[in-house]
Amino acid sequence: MRASYDVAIAGGGIVGAACAEACAAAGLSVAVAEPGPIGGGATAAGMGHVVVMDDSPAQLALTQYSRALWIERMAELPPEVEYLPCGTIWVAADEEEMQECRRKAAVAQAQGVAAKVLDGRQLAEAEPHLRPGLAGGLLVPDDSTIYPPCAARWLLERSRADMIREAAAAIAPGEIRLRNGGKISAGVAVNATGAWSPELTPGIEVRKRKGHLAITDRYPGFVRHVLVELGYLKSAHSLTSDSVAFNAQPRRTGQVLLGSSRQFGVEDGAIEAAMLRRMLDRCQEYMPELAALTAIRTWTGFRAATPDKLPLIGPTADPRLYLATGHEGLGITTSLATGQLVAAQICGRATAIPAEPYLPGRKQEAH
């Protein structure tokens, strides 16, 4: 470990790894404090969906920019990252949801994002295991999936950052204090510890949001695209109630990853049988044949949620302390963009997209 670094990052998940890689590429010396597995925590628990989302113009800008960065790197990604350009289909159960498909398509196309509205017949042809009678859907063909833990490890390896295998006890401008009594000194310290970031930076508006997931044995071709019910958007927007929504994702291994659930105010990471059953029942409502598949593992994780559904990226009131947290369910998608925004601001360069919507000092209003 050096006496001092240009940048010290707390957190070795995919966001911290992307920040390390981008800062190193900008010529900065980097250290990363992470006591656990690289790409553990929410990175290991997440679905790995790289997706453009349009809840707000700022969310659309960030996810579109970051998805483009993933596409640019497609040829570089090692096989273990399991990059799968399968596309997303937002599934509409009725005419009201079809109207939302058409709205989302118009927004996407206006921003240069490929999107195609599917009628019921086209949806059934694209995904024959969905239940009959669904109204249609919206295909976003350039979305993809990755295996996040391996992606995080790849990014950190590329960064050549010094790995400090100790937990951060506190973070201050230009300094990470370690639980073993040591410290990492740097020009800028970055808090990239996800759902645990308020423990290091008290007062920031980040809350834990628990989720359950399940994965099946190998059934190649059973699901061809990432499938998400449009009701997912309602559950994702709820800031108080527990919710579930159908989300099925193909893996390059042939497995099917199933979600999703959302819970606030739960600190215990244990699997809750009732919530898991509720989630799987919802999935079977959309894909009845899932009942015949064998689930081989279930787990939980904690998303880092903010009131306005946008991450905290950039300098705090003290420019020697940065935040890179609050990505909720979009940390995998937006990790590369987060790294680029952090590196550009540290170096005093112009950012590729406006940084203001994500700055930690913004006024947040719940969406």
Segments the model singles out, each with a brief description of its role:
Residues 15, 38, 196:
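Conserved Rossmann-like nucleotide-cofactor binding loop
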Residues 3-5, 179-188:
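Core beta-strand elements of the Rossmann-like FAD/NAD(P) dinucleotide-binding domain
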Residues 47-126, 245, 282-284:
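Dinucleotide-binding Rossmann-like beta1-alpha1 core, especially the glycine-rich loop
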Residues 21-22, 50, 81-83, 195-317:
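Active-site substrate-recognition segment that forms the wall
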Residues 278, 284-367:
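C-terminal catalytic lobe of FAD-dependent flavoproteins
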Residues 138-174, 178-180:
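Helical element adjacent to the flavin cofactor pocket in flavoenzyme catalytic cores
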